[in-house]
Amino acid sequence: MSAKDVKFGVDARDKMLRGVDILANAVKVTLGPKGRNVVLEKSFGAPRITKDGVTVAKEIELDDKFENMGAQMVREVASKSADAAGDGTTTATVLAQAIVKEGAKSVAAGMNPMDLKRGIDLAVEAVVADLSRNSKKVTSNEEIAQVGTISANGDSEIGKFLADAMKKVGNEGVITVEEAKSLETELDVVEGMQFDRGYISPYFVTNAEKMRVEMDDAYILINEKKLSSLNELLPLLEAVVQTGKPLVIVAEDVEGEALATLVVNRLRGGLKVAAVKAPGFGDRRKAMLQDIAILTGGQAISEDLGIKLENVTLQMLGRAKKVMIDKENTTIVNGAGKKADIEARVAQIKAQIEETTSDYDREKLQERLAKLAGGVAVIRVGGATEVEVKERKDRVDDAMHATRAAVEEGIVPGGGVALLRASEQLKRIKTQNDDQKTGVEIVRKALSAPARQIAINAGEDGSVIVGKILEKEQYSYGFDSQTGDYGNLISKGIIDPTKVVRTAIQNAASVASLLITTEAMVAELPKKNSPAPAMPGGGMGGMDF
């Protein structure tokens, strides 16, 4: 085990504070509509330009081990806020820096760190209660567009795209962001359920021009196993032919005699049929087939359930208004599943999302949820250069998470005003002793930091602006740093999702109070590089000449 370097008390906190300041100062220049860009060096390719707080925070590693520990703790604040609400990373970093700075002064003055922490916790509870009390529900498309615009640093085009996407796929629908190949940003919406499996044979194609299968009012057979022999399928095929409706077969695979017979029947025009492979693998495939069954009002045919293919009746098949299959994807639109069944399945998947610890599983579950709940929207972000596209994609990602958060918990005035107003409530908090009171006061002072920083980034005097905002009683009254005017921020469209502001203050206070109560720090000493061993002597030992 290598030797360690240990620092205590003021020494440790000073080093840690320096690290906190370096990271927070780099991140906070991006705050607000007039925030500046940060250029990040890449080991290969062009440098990356960003205004996204968490992206900047993730790039910072410091040489000094103790300073780096402080910086990494604050980086955790930004990451946690990004994970929970998808935005508010810079606000959280600014708050954490302000709380740590004031807290360290109080500890140095001899106050009890644990009482300070209790005071901070009391203050945060009061702030969260005040935010939820003043939160306004988001209902209209315009409000969603406003939230998206603010989070995308005032880019109204991004706000509009997000509002359109949410309108089309619903609040539960999946919105993915991709890089476009062109200059234009565009929105592409897939209605219904789509999975990434195409037709097994091109002979099933009905629309030769677009090379895809299009079937209206189709039956859907959902089978878990391979289909290779046709005998077990014959009774069902005859029943489908008599209805005159088309049939889509979703199975692990269709091969040999079964595939040949289906293709021949399709070409002769006796049976409108198409076959696709089942999506996913293993247990995930079973779950996805069950999703398709619930969406279409059918039953997944599985030997686990004791259902044999020869016993399948028309009632066990799913139905859909339209099925489209191309070379790579299958889309089922307007399945005939019962609304109550689909809602129950959605609730079940939501519960699994809450429980899972794996990010990959969560992503896959959210995809399944979206396919059941509404559909998938893809925003393709365009731009003139690769650097511009990447920077814009960052902002679209931020804005997408912010709009989701706004729909979930509502909105409050932006520009740091909601936290400023909450700071007024902290004057009424009753504490058990003076040190706890100081803890509350630390948070009260810190709550003005985001509004102050937004003003500073806009070239104004932060303290003057904070003073002017607090002079007015009106909750939504604040400073619009884009135009330099004061007024009602909600009616101006300057708004923040309540969830973003809430997670920012909770995460900032959580990490900051841990830093304040730190009394010792342990880091590895750098290894001394020993000189390389001398080269062995030349010649060929043991040889007689």
Swiss-Prot record:
Organism this protein belongs to: Nitrobacter winogradskyi (strain ATCC 25391 / DSM 10237 / CIP 104748 / NCIMB 11846 / Nb-255)
Catalytic activity from the UniProt record: ATP + H2O + a folded polypeptide = ADP + phosphate + an unfolded polypeptide
UniProt protein name: Chaperonin GroEL 2
GO cellular component: cytoplasm
GO BP terms, alphabetized: protein refolding
EC number: 5.6.1.7
InterPro entries in UniProt: Chaperonin_Cpn60_CS, Cpn60/GroEL, Cpn60/GroEL/TCP-1, GroEL-like_apical_dom_sf, GROEL-like_equatorial_sf, TCP-1-like_intermed_sf
Sample GO molecular function, one term: ATP binding
Keywords, ordered alphabetically: ATP-binding, Chaperone, Cytoplasm, Isomerase, Nucleotide-binding
Protein location: Cytoplasm
Primary gene name: groEL2
Highest taxon in the source lineage: Bacteria
Described function: Together with its co-chaperonin GroES, plays an essential role in assisting protein folding. The GroEL-GroES system forms a nano-cage that allows encapsulation of the non-native substrate proteins and provides a physical environment optimized to promote and accelerate protein folding.
Family assignment from sequence similarity: Belongs to the chaperonin (HSP60) family.
Sequence positions that bind ATP: 30-33, 51, 87-91, 415, 496
Assembly description: Forms a cylinder of 14 subunits composed of two heptameric rings stacked back-to-back. Interacts with the co-chaperonin GroES.
